[in-house]
Amino acid sequence: MTGIALYAPAPPRPALVASPGRVVLDGTTKALVHVAAPRGHQVIDVSLAPYALDLRGRPRLGGGAHAPRWVSARPLHLRVGPAGAVVTLAAAPPRGAVPGDRPFALVLTTRGVRGKSVAVRLRIGVLVIAHVRGKVVRRLVIGPVVARSGRLVELTIRNTGNAVERLARGRLVLTLLRRGRVVVRLHPPPRELLPRSRAVIVTRLPRSLHGPATVRVSLGSFVHRYPLRL
Protein backbone atom coordinates (compact mmCIF):
# COMPACT_ATOMS: atom_id res chain seq x y z
CA MET A 1 0.00 0.00 0.00
CA THR A 2 1.40 3.33 -1.04
CA GLY A 3 0.62 6.53 0.79
CA ILE A 4 0.79 9.91 -0.83
CA ALA A 5 1.34 12.95 1.33
CA LEU A 6 -0.21 16.14 0.07
CA TYR A 7 1.31 19.43 1.11
CA ALA A 8 -0.40 22.74 0.60
CA PRO A 9 2.00 25.36 -0.73
CA ALA A 10 3.00 28.02 1.73
CA PRO A 11 1.21 31.32 1.16
CA PRO A 12 3.39 33.85 -0.67
CA ARG A 13 5.13 36.39 1.48
CA PRO A 14 3.68 39.89 1.15
CA ALA A 15 5.81 42.38 -0.77
CA LEU A 16 5.30 45.10 1.83
CA VAL A 17 4.11 45.04 5.44
CA ALA A 18 3.64 47.66 8.15
CA SER A 19 3.11 47.28 11.88
CA PRO A 20 1.06 48.31 13.75
CA GLY A 21 -1.86 48.63 11.37
CA ARG A 22 -3.52 51.27 13.55
CA VAL A 23 -1.89 54.19 15.37
CA VAL A 24 -3.36 56.65 17.87
CA LEU A 25 -1.56 59.96 18.40
CA ASP A 26 -2.87 61.30 21.71
CA GLY A 27 -2.00 64.97 22.06
CA THR A 28 1.62 65.97 21.51
CA THR A 29 3.32 62.66 20.94
CA LYS A 30 5.25 60.41 18.56
CA ALA A 31 4.66 56.89 17.26
CA LEU A 32 6.82 54.46 15.30
CA VAL A 33 5.62 52.35 12.37
CA HIS A 34 7.83 49.44 11.34
CA VAL A 35 7.94 48.86 7.57
CA ALA A 36 9.46 45.77 5.93
CA ALA A 37 9.77 44.26 2.44
CA PRO A 38 10.02 40.46 2.99
CA ARG A 39 10.65 39.66 -0.70
CA GLY A 40 13.57 42.02 -1.21
CA HIS A 41 14.63 45.62 -0.99
CA GLN A 42 12.16 48.32 -2.01
CA VAL A 43 12.28 52.09 -2.20
CA ILE A 44 9.24 53.47 -0.40
CA ASP A 45 7.54 56.85 -0.71
CA VAL A 46 5.80 58.00 2.48
CA SER A 47 2.80 60.33 2.54
CA LEU A 48 -0.35 61.21 4.48
CA ALA A 49 -3.77 60.95 2.85
CA PRO A 50 -7.47 61.27 3.69
CA TYR A 51 -9.07 58.10 5.07
CA ALA A 52 -12.73 57.12 5.07
CA LEU A 53 -15.02 54.14 5.45
CA ASP A 54 -17.78 53.50 2.92
CA LEU A 55 -21.35 52.74 4.00
CA ARG A 56 -20.50 49.05 4.42
CA GLY A 57 -17.38 49.75 6.48
CA ARG A 58 -14.78 49.12 3.78
CA PRO A 59 -11.74 51.42 4.08
CA ARG A 60 -10.76 53.71 1.23
CA LEU A 61 -8.21 56.42 0.69
CA GLY A 62 -9.69 59.79 -0.16
CA GLY A 63 -13.13 61.14 0.56
CA GLY A 64 -12.34 62.10 4.14
CA ALA A 65 -10.61 65.04 5.76
CA HIS A 66 -6.92 65.64 5.09
CA ALA A 67 -4.35 64.94 7.77
CA PRO A 68 -3.87 67.89 10.14
CA ARG A 69 -0.98 70.19 9.27
CA TRP A 70 0.45 69.62 12.74
CA VAL A 71 1.08 65.93 12.01
CA SER A 72 4.25 64.88 10.19
CA ALA A 73 5.79 61.64 8.91
CA ARG A 74 9.55 61.18 8.55
CA PRO A 75 11.38 60.18 6.46
CA LEU A 76 9.41 60.81 3.27
CA HIS A 77 11.51 58.25 1.35
CA LEU A 78 13.31 55.17 2.58
CA ARG A 79 14.83 51.94 1.37
CA VAL A 80 13.63 48.86 3.21
CA GLY A 81 14.35 45.14 3.07
CA PRO A 82 13.36 42.08 5.09
CA ALA A 83 14.84 43.59 8.27
CA GLY A 84 12.69 46.67 7.86
CA ALA A 85 12.96 50.33 8.78
CA VAL A 86 10.99 52.81 10.87
CA VAL A 87 8.71 55.70 9.94
CA THR A 88 8.15 58.24 12.72
CA LEU A 89 4.79 59.96 13.11
CA ALA A 90 4.73 63.12 15.22
CA ALA A 91 1.76 65.22 16.36
CA ALA A 92 1.90 68.71 17.87
CA PRO A 93 -1.62 70.17 17.99
CA PRO A 94 -1.55 73.94 18.48
CA ARG A 95 -3.21 75.68 21.39
CA GLY A 96 -6.89 76.14 20.60
CA ALA A 97 -7.17 73.09 18.33
CA VAL A 98 -10.72 71.71 18.34
CA PRO A 99 -10.98 68.58 20.53
CA GLY A 100 -11.77 65.22 18.98
CA ASP A 101 -10.46 62.51 16.69
CA ARG A 102 -9.01 63.17 13.23
CA PRO A 103 -8.59 59.98 11.18
CA PHE A 104 -6.26 59.81 8.19
CA ALA A 105 -3.88 57.32 6.58
CA LEU A 106 -0.13 56.86 6.52
CA VAL A 107 0.42 55.71 2.93
CA LEU A 108 3.45 53.63 1.91
CA THR A 109 4.02 53.26 -1.84
CA THR A 110 6.72 51.23 -3.56
CA ARG A 111 8.48 52.64 -6.60
CA GLY A 112 8.44 50.79 -9.89
CA VAL A 113 11.63 48.95 -10.82
CA ARG A 114 13.62 50.69 -13.55
CA GLY A 115 14.20 48.78 -16.73
CA LYS A 116 10.97 46.77 -16.60
CA SER A 117 8.39 47.30 -19.32
CA VAL A 118 5.58 47.40 -16.75
CA ALA A 119 6.26 49.19 -13.49
CA VAL A 120 4.17 47.72 -10.67
CA ARG A 121 3.69 49.91 -7.62
CA LEU A 122 2.25 48.58 -4.37
CA ARG A 123 0.46 50.84 -1.92
CA ILE A 124 -0.64 50.05 1.63
CA GLY A 125 -2.15 52.26 4.30
CA VAL A 126 -1.99 52.47 8.08
CA LEU A 127 -4.94 54.04 9.90
CA VAL A 128 -3.85 56.96 12.08
CA ILE A 129 -6.11 58.76 14.55
CA ALA A 130 -4.83 62.08 15.85
CA HIS A 131 -6.66 62.86 19.08
CA VAL A 132 -6.88 66.39 20.47
CA ARG A 133 -7.65 66.36 24.16
CA GLY A 134 -10.68 68.17 25.48
CA LYS A 135 -14.42 67.59 25.58
CA VAL A 136 -15.35 64.33 23.87
CA VAL A 137 -18.80 64.33 22.25
CA ARG A 138 -20.32 60.89 21.67
CA ARG A 139 -23.53 61.13 19.68
CA LEU A 140 -25.03 58.46 17.44
CA VAL A 141 -28.22 59.00 15.43
CA ILE A 142 -29.85 55.60 14.92
CA GLY A 143 -32.35 54.76 12.20
CA PRO A 144 -34.14 54.25 9.94
CA VAL A 145 -34.48 50.49 9.54
CA VAL A 146 -35.32 49.13 6.09
CA ALA A 147 -36.07 45.60 4.83
CA ARG A 148 -34.60 44.35 1.55
CA SER A 149 -35.79 41.27 -0.36
CA GLY A 150 -37.47 39.69 2.67
CA ARG A 151 -34.19 38.54 4.23
CA LEU A 152 -31.97 41.58 4.57
CA VAL A 153 -32.42 44.23 7.25
CA GLU A 154 -30.51 47.51 6.92
CA LEU A 155 -29.96 49.88 9.84
CA THR A 156 -28.50 53.35 9.26
CA ILE A 157 -26.34 54.93 11.97
CA ARG A 158 -24.77 58.39 11.84
CA ASN A 159 -21.92 59.46 14.06
CA THR A 160 -22.44 63.17 14.68
CA GLY A 161 -19.93 63.32 17.54
CA ASN A 162 -16.23 64.12 17.46
CA ALA A 163 -14.86 60.68 18.45
CA VAL A 164 -14.39 57.38 16.66
CA GLU A 165 -17.10 54.93 17.76
CA ARG A 166 -16.35 51.20 17.83
CA LEU A 167 -19.35 48.88 17.87
CA ALA A 168 -17.96 45.64 19.27
CA ARG A 169 -19.83 42.40 18.62
CA GLY A 170 -22.73 42.11 21.03
CA ARG A 171 -23.01 45.83 21.70
CA LEU A 172 -25.58 46.32 18.92
CA VAL A 173 -28.56 43.92 18.89
CA LEU A 174 -31.51 43.87 16.50
CA THR A 175 -34.51 41.86 17.72
CA LEU A 176 -37.24 41.00 15.21
CA LEU A 177 -40.72 40.85 16.76
CA ARG A 178 -44.05 39.68 15.36
CA ARG A 179 -47.20 40.10 17.42
CA GLY A 180 -45.01 40.90 20.40
CA ARG A 181 -43.08 37.64 20.21
CA VAL A 182 -39.37 37.35 19.48
CA VAL A 183 -38.71 35.77 16.08
CA VAL A 184 -34.93 36.18 15.97
CA ARG A 185 -32.13 38.22 17.50
CA LEU A 186 -29.52 39.55 15.11
CA HIS A 187 -25.97 40.39 16.20
CA PRO A 188 -24.26 42.44 13.47
CA PRO A 189 -20.49 42.09 13.03
CA PRO A 190 -18.21 44.70 14.65
CA ARG A 191 -18.13 48.10 12.97
CA GLU A 192 -16.31 51.37 13.35
CA LEU A 193 -17.82 54.78 12.73
CA LEU A 194 -15.57 57.76 12.09
CA PRO A 195 -16.64 61.22 13.28
CA ARG A 196 -19.23 62.89 11.05
CA SER A 197 -19.81 59.73 9.01
CA ARG A 198 -22.67 57.40 8.18
CA ALA A 199 -22.83 53.61 8.17
CA VAL A 200 -25.35 51.05 6.95
CA ILE A 201 -25.44 47.89 9.07
CA VAL A 202 -26.71 44.94 7.03
CA THR A 203 -27.95 41.76 8.73
CA ARG A 204 -29.46 38.67 7.15
CA LEU A 205 -32.50 36.88 8.53
CA PRO A 206 -32.16 33.10 8.94
CA ARG A 207 -35.16 32.59 6.67
CA SER A 208 -37.35 34.61 4.36
CA LEU A 209 -40.20 36.37 6.16
CA HIS A 210 -43.06 38.43 4.81
CA GLY A 211 -45.56 40.84 6.28
CA PRO A 212 -45.49 43.45 9.04
CA ALA A 213 -42.99 43.18 11.88
CA THR A 214 -41.16 45.29 14.44
CA VAL A 215 -37.41 45.65 14.94
CA ARG A 216 -36.16 46.52 18.41
CA VAL A 217 -32.72 48.15 18.22
CA SER A 218 -30.61 48.00 21.38
CA LEU A 219 -27.31 49.86 21.64
CA GLY A 220 -26.14 50.43 25.20
CA SER A 221 -28.86 52.37 26.99
CA PHE A 222 -30.59 53.16 23.69
CA VAL A 223 -33.63 50.97 22.95
CA HIS A 224 -36.13 51.83 20.24
CA ARG A 225 -38.69 49.98 18.13
CA TYR A 226 -39.12 50.53 14.42
CA PRO A 227 -42.04 49.27 12.31
CA LEU A 228 -40.91 47.11 9.41
CA ARG A 229 -42.59 45.52 6.41
CA LEU A 230 -40.84 42.44 5.09
Predicted feature residues:
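Beta-sheet-dominated interaction scaffolds and their linkers
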Residues: 6-40, 139-154
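Surface-exposed binding patches on compact interaction domains or structured appendages
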Residues: 11-20, 39-88, 168-183
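Short proline/glycine- and polar residue-rich coil/turn motifs
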Residues: 25, 77-85, 190-199
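Short, solvent-exposed loop/turn segments enriched in Ser/Thr/Gly
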Residues: 26-32, 84-87, 97-105, 149-153
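Exposed aromatic-hydrophobic patches
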Residues: 32, 86-88, 198-206
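Terminal connector regions
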Residues: 38, 42, 49-52, 61, ...
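Short amphipathic, basic-aromatic surface patches that mediate peripheral association
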Residues: 159-163
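Surface-exposed loop/edge segments in extracytoplasmic proteins
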Residues: 178-188, 223-226
